[in-house]
Amino acid sequence: FIDTWGLIAPADPARAARYAVTAASVSHDGEGLHGAAFMAAAISKAFETSDMEEIIAAGLQQIPADCLYRKVFDAVERCYRNDPQDWRACLAMLQAEWGYDKYPGVCHIIPNAGVCALALYYGRGDFARTIELASMCGWDTDCNAGNVGTILGVAVGPQGIDECYRGPINDEIVLSGISGYSQLQQKAVRTGLPSGGREMPGASGAGWDAAL
């Protein structure tokens, strides 16, 4: 659910992170709030640039330098710098040093933050490759692929998402409740309502229209 805050605060990572932390505080604390801030800020930054390292840096700027969320990202980055091709070696490192056995509960955020970092680095700005890596790594596959998919979807725009992903969905969505959507495949509706009527910063990346 945290993706929303990056989407309504384009090109403003700090505001996106602030909204995300406020919302996430209802059900999360600690590292969960850092994860919310990172994801929302990264999505927001993706409206300005498709450079994945800039996007990651913008997200990391919104969380403490000494938190575990930042540390697992740093560990993945070191693996990537050492060998940008061998994502499996990076996954093995995550499983050995940051795996589920190191944290309480059944679905801790830190191992999954590592998977998101892996997908973002090794995916290198390719939408399909990034969500595929997030899924192939296992653990919390739906959230991980969904989070990085939102970042990449904004960064590359509709034209950067292959037809094999867009075509089957087309303009239809199946939900457990009653909802209505129009032109899901191509159209992103932006209004001034989320910003309280204030003009949003220009979102220049991936062909996004800066006008409200």
Where do the language-model regions lie?
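A glycine-rich phosphate-binding loop feature that marks nucleotide/adenosyl-phosphate handling sites
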Residues: 38, 59-62, 76-77, 151, ...
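Accessory "access/gating" subregions that flank catalytic or transport cores
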Residues: 2-13, 21-26, 40-138
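Short, well-structured active-site flanking segments
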Residues: 13-16, 160-162
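Short, conserved phosphate-binding/catalytic loop or strand-edge motifs used
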Residues: 15-23, 36-37, 169-171
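Catalytic phosphate/nucleotide-handling subdomain of diverse soluble enzymes
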Residues: 28, 39, 117-189
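Catalytic cores of secreted or luminal carbohydrate-active enzymes
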Residues: 177-212
